[in-house]
UniProtKB/Swiss-Prot annotation:
Catalytic residues in the record: 39
Name of this protein: tRNA pseudouridine synthase B
Organism for this UniProt entry: Rickettsia africae (strain ESF-5)
Family in the record: Belongs to the pseudouridine synthase TruB family. Type 1 subfamily.
Gene coding for it: truB
Alphabetical list of CDD domains matching this protein: PseudoU_synth_EcTruB
Role, per record: Responsible for synthesis of pseudouridine from uracil-55 in the psi GC loop of transfer RNAs.
Top-level taxonomy: Bacteria, Pseudomonadati, Pseudomonadota, Alphaproteobacteria, Rickettsiales
Catalytic activity: uridine(55) in tRNA = pseudouridine(55) in tRNA
Length: 345
């Protein structure tokens, strides 16, 4: 098996690039990528894509992520974490009540300025390189979403608080920590940071590796996750021989809504159940049973009548991932085509 995901746990003290080198030494010559760089001082989930799974990395980068982080109040560092130099201090330390209550202010859509010590580029140069040289770094604000934020623990003696957050892509926890502290009329920096989840990948079943000698290639592959795992919550269509051939060779491919739709899950609607139809804030849906499997699925009525475009879906051929793309009415537009099977014509 050469196309799969690995749920790797990056330890604190090594870079994401160093962990990539370790995994490459174990697996040998194969295409490898990862979804979402972690700082050297951070630890946690770093999903690895192997082989054709690298074509899906962009989906994981867009996925929600969860973190647990600890803030030290009363000081600010130039990097936003304990690796930097202290550049300011303040005697004002928040109370436990304040540390808990401030969370509600940050839930929702937030504008955040990335830290100077980041991998973002300024005129083609990494921001952290400019910051290390003492140069002024100006980065544009970006819009992010904080889905959840709560205080887990407050240590008055050490002036620290530990928080949990679920957030969108592009969120910098070091900046979030600084903004939390400022909102509490204090200063702060991150002393511990752990990423606990990226999409479907969670820390409780992650593989922990510190050196290439700790695990063999076979043992690592035994812990692999199928390439389709991250696609479980989006629409999937099953292609016939002729449809699969059209997709493989980049030709126009049409699907019949009545015959080809098999699965639709997790539509982002809040629905109110009404008989055998469901009313949504954005669309109507129809409950239908798939006679071939006995399973019940929900189809938007717009899709049922071929009036709705689908931004992202995937196509199977003989049970194996063939392509991902979009659907414009009944026409499939391929974004990525995968070579996972030799069973082709």
């Amino acid at each position: 098996m050469s196309n799969y995901w690995l749920n790797i746990y990056k330890p604190r003290g090594i870079s994401s690039a160093q962990l990539v080198s370790i995994v490459k030494k174990i697996l040998g010559k194969t295409k490898i990528g990862h979804a979402g760089t972690l700082d050297v001082e951070a630890e946690g989930i770093l999903p690895f894509a192997v082989g054709e799974a690298t074509k899906l990395i962009h989906l994981l980068i867009d996925a929600r992520k969860t973190y647990i982080f600890t803030i030290k109040f009363g000081m600010q560092t130039n990097s936003g974490d304990c690796a930097g130099k202290v550049i300011a201090t303040k005697d004002c330390i928040p109370s436990q009540e304040e540390a808990y209550a401030v969370c509600s202010k940050f839930i929702g859509n937030v504008t955040q300025i990335p830290p100077a010590f980041s991998a973002l580029k300024v005129n083609g140069v990494r921001a952290y390189k400019l910051a290390r040289e003492g140069k002024k770094v100006e980065l544009k604000p970006r819009n992010i979403t904080i889905y959840d934020l709560k205080c887990l623990n407050f240590d008055e003696k050490n002036a620290t608080a530990t928080y949990y957050t679920e957030c969108s892509k592009g969120t910098y926890i070091r900046t979030l920590a600084e903004d939390l502290a400022l909102s509490l009329q204090s200063l702060g920096f991150v002393i511990e940071l752990r990423r606990t989840q990226v999409g479907i990948f969670k820390e409780e079943n992650a593989i922990r590796i510190k050196s290439p000698d700790e695990i063999t290639k076979n043992a690592l592959e035994e812990k692999s996750i199928k390439i389709e795992a991250i696609l479980d919550d989006i629409l999937v269509l099953d292609a016939t021989d002729s449809q699969a051939q059209q997709i493989k060779y980049g030709q126009k491919c049409l699907f019949n809504y009545e015959k080809d739709f098999r699965h639709l899950a997790k539509f982002a609607y809040r629905e109110e159940f009404k008989g055998n139809t469901e009313r949504s804030t954005t669309a109507y849906t129809l409950v239908r049973e798939d006679a071939s499997t006995g399973l019940t699925y929900k189809l938007p009525l717009e899709v049922e009548f071929g009036k709705m475009s689908v931004d992202l879906l995937w196509v199977r051929y003989k049970g194996t991932l063939l392509a991902i793309g979009s659907l414009n009415k009944s026409c499939f537009n391929s974004l990525r085509v995968f070579n996972l099977t030799q069973d082709f014509f």
